[in-house]
Amino acid sequence: MIDILEHINAVQREVSRTGETVSLQMRRAYRATPEELWDALTDPTRLARWFWPTTGNFQVGGSFQLQDMAGGDILECEPPKGFKVTYGGPNSFLEIRLHPAANDSTDLELEHVVTGIPMPGAGGALYVGPGWDGGLLGLALYVAGLPDDHNPVTFADSPEMLKFNEQSVRAWLKVVRDSGTTSEEDLLEAAKVSMAQFAPGVEL
């Protein structure tokens, strides 16, 4: 069993908006070196253990594809400091930055910038934020040592993960509300869509 609130609270979340562009930022510390995290984030074999089955050529000019999900192009790649890719479309950019910290730990920063999300204000962060929360959780579980039979695809639909997703949606709801970029009506509509996707059957 995972401590859901511990993992939710381990992440710092921010959201901002400039015109039609929404930026989502996340930060979390990991008890692993930047080199260890880099391998976990870019080696398809390791990605399949904690995130999702992935194929591709992880170098500048290469591309990647998540099984039955998003893909993109590698725009920047500087191991073990970070990378920048398109994610799911030409107007969606994902950047990961790894910063060495004390005692062989690493501070990970994730930024996802999207232009033209079909939701007013920064409410679109509720469409992608919970998914990245799940990814950062998976990485934390991987660093701590996953059991041999762990499958991230089936784990994504487990009751435990759905409870985690519910708390993630609520966390992002607060972050977007505090940003002041979205009306309450539009925000609640985005939250309902997000909850239906990430935690079906749960009411706000």
Spans of features found by a protein language model:
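A generic structural signal for alpha-helix starts
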Residues: 32-35, 42-45, 126-130, 134
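Hydrophobic pocket/interface hotspot
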Residues: 37-38, 47, 74, 108, ...
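Short beta-edge strand/loop motif at the mouth of beta-sheet-based domains
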Residues: 18-21, 25-26, 32-36, 44-82
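Terminal "cap-and-tail" regions of soluble proteins that handle hydrophobic small molecules
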Residues: 1-19, 113-204
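Amphipathic hydrophobic-ligand
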Residues: 90-91
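Short, structured patches in soluble enzyme cores that scaffold and shape functional sites
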Residues: 100, 110-114
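Short, low-complexity Ser/Thr-rich regulatory SLiMs
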Residues: 76, 98-102
